[in-house]
């Protein structure tokens, strides 16, 4: 190309995202979806989900599960700090559980913390989580955000956390800014994040073409078509949302295993994924995402119309 048409690439110094103005930013009380995702950036948790939706340690260095007594013994990593430089310790975990329970069903994390009977602290880095029921002694019940025991105030919107980012500023109706947590144990993030607050998310693809927004999450069935139309790069990611078929065994028809098999064989999951979800889905032989907990193989139930009619 000649000099006049030469393209110059400019390195971005900020990540621009988009969000709705939430009703509240409080980590334990907000039910806004955007705030839930922001929580993953601002706060650490004992355990987190990886790209295959498997449970992996976050601020935990060692753990053991006693399923007979319903207890999980945990030792924290030694280098985890909140964004104010203070160390995360056992008392912070205990206080976080108490705050979630105090928020009751208004908290999206209450379903996890409500199963915990108590936190038995051994020292600043080790403690035991005692569950009400032994069957609840599961690591996926320990995926809630951790806040500082001393700094948090009930109902506050921008509590400090120990995640890769920290709240840095909020202009209502306009922007929310996150700065890198310079104490983050996993390494300091290179770029700050600015959330541009919008009233209609349908305008976001257009904002991306103008470089106002760097990236966004699209959960609609035509997400890939929108990306292709706007010439945007996109990547499919795993989701915990699912659809499943359930049977009431008390029903006189559904109590018959042959009847249940006939219905199951009549459903073509691949066609549902293709025509209802524009291929933005996967099949699984359980209610969990494929490869969850190391499951490598799937037991496919082949759709067979003729055999279905024979039951």
Which stretches of residues belong to each language-model region?
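Periplasmic-binding protein-like
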Residues: 250, 254-293
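N-terminal lobe/hinge region of extracytoplasmic solute-binding protein
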Residues: 18-67, 98, 160
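Short helices/loops that flank or line small-molecule/ion binding pockets
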Residues: 85-86, 201-213, 228-229, 257
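Surface-exposed binding/hinge segments that line
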Residues: 64, 109-152, 171
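Structural transition elements
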Residues: 281-311
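Aromatic- and charge-enriched surface segment that lines or borders ligand/interaction sites
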Residues: 61-106, 253
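Short, well-ordered beta-strand elements
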Residues: 11-21, 71-74, 96, 127, ...
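Aromatic-rich, solvent-exposed beta-strand/loop patch
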Residues: 83, 130-146, 159-201, 223-241
